[in-house]
Amino acid sequence: NCYHTYYPFFPGLSERNWTDEWLDAKNLEESEPKNFGDKEYTLYEAKQKQRQMELAMRAQREKVRLLQKGKADPDEILLHKAKYQGQLNEYSRFCRKMKLTEERERIYLDMKGRVATNSKRQNALFPREMIENASKDVAQYKRYKEVLGDYIGSLVNFGQMKYNDSEKWKIIS
């Protein structure tokens, strides 16, 4: 994660690349915090957050691939793809706001191609809260499906009911 470059320096022979004034200005610029959401980040903290986001997206890509290999419920796969798409969008917003270069090659290390949902229509099937809480909501859906059977409907219907139809949700929960 270090972005330093080292060169041999021989006192009396070598010339410095940067003046003390330039280095002081650069240090001041890099230590200036920027806001994203409800948190402030210095350049170093922003780069750490960027790496954390990339790691989370690689994990989500792997989860989608494993669900596909395991022939999971298509709605569950779609929900996790939508979560991945949301992570990508958040990553782009974060990098723009922090003036960082997006390093998507760090996300695509698995060389497995496209994982995100294909359209906004697919993303719109699930409420935003459900996309954020994908794993918990899928587990909850499976428990309800075990008890209530087909009455609970599909994962898409479950999400719509839980987050958008409070009357029906009160009845079943």
Regions found by a protein language model. Give the residues of each.
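Activation/maturation switch segments at domain boundaries
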Residues: 1-173
